[in-house]
């Protein structure tokens, strides 16, 4: 937001959030090597149960902080998180494609690609290529990027598939390959064809108890990615009536301010790039005029 507008308060938000991530969210000491340098999962009490997994470690924000401030701790923290991700990926949890949900290795890939783009250090690439290969095996064995939920249940979780698609797309932009492009299109086609309710909106998860409206903006980014890859506007028209709801939720106007009911800073960070990416695609195609705002 600061880069687009020059409004200082957005930079202040970045600095405060990045310093919190660097000082509080990252493990600075532990006898467990799988924790050192990694980012705690956001849980009650900040690190209840001491959980650390690839799906809850992010580096792009602290890299942005490094670029805006010159504070080398930003880059150092990003590298330490990346090193932690590399160690976690060598654990049994990630050994077999399909035994962890798509967002686990999806978020890991996104972090590692960002670190490669920033540093050009090829140490990040080996696991990137391993993750890409695991997604290919996953699709071949299960038909799609299904997520394990019980010992005998595999389901679609659209937003988790979208995490994977967004991360694979970031790799594709650096290392374009036709097989990766086609794998992405198939994954997003699966979301469009199988992850919607009768009302035309995406569902949360493919379980009867969780098959409710899902407005995670990562789903919109996946549609924009499919449009970028194919030029077909049908992807942008899918679920277009959910766009306004996903963007603003409930809101009220007070004087010249629009107040949106609260979400976490993580929620904002996760939503901003998907919304802007989708909005740009709608603007480029003229479909923005079809969006209903709530």
Where are these regions (language model features)?
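Catalytic cores of extracellular degradative/oxidative enzymes
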Residues: 1-201, 205-228, 232-294
């Amino acid at each position: 937001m600061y880069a687009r507008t020059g409004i200082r308060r957005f930079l202040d938000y970045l600095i405060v959030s990045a310093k919190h991530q660097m000082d509080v969210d990252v493990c600075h000491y532990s006898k467990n090597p799988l924790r050192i340098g990694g980012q705690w999962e956001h849980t009650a009490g900040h690190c209840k149960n001491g959980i650390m997994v690839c799906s809850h470690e992010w580096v792009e924000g602290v890299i942005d902080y490094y670029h805006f401030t010159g504070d080398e701790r930003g880059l150092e923290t990003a590298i330490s998180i990346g090193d932690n991700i590399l160690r976690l990926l060598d654990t049994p949890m990630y050994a077999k494609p399909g035994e962890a949900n798509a967002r686990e290795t999806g978020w890991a890939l996104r972090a590692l690609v960002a670190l490669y783009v920033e540093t050009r250090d090829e140490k990040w690439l080996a696991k990137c290529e391993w993750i890409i290969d695991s997604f290919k095996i996953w699709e071949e064995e299960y038909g799609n990027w299904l997520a394990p939920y019980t010992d005998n249940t595999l389901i679609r979780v659209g937003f988790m598939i979208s995490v994977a698609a967004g991360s694979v797309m970031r790799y594709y932009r650096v290392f374009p390959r036709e097989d990766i492009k086609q794998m992405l299109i198939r994954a997003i086609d699966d979301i469009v064809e199988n992850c919607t309710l009768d009302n035309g909106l995406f569902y949360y998860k493919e379980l009867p108890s969780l098959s409710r409206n899902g407005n995670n903006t990562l789903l919109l980014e996946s549609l924009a990615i499919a449009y970028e890859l194919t030029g077909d506007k049908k992807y942008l028209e899918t679920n277009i009536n959910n766009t306004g709801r996903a963007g603003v939720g409930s809101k009220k106007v007070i004087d010249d301010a629009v107040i949106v009911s609260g979400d976490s800073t993580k929620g904002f960070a996760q939503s901003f790039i998907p919304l802007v990416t989708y909005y740009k695609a709608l603007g480029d195609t003229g479909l923005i005029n079809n969006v209903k705002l709530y």
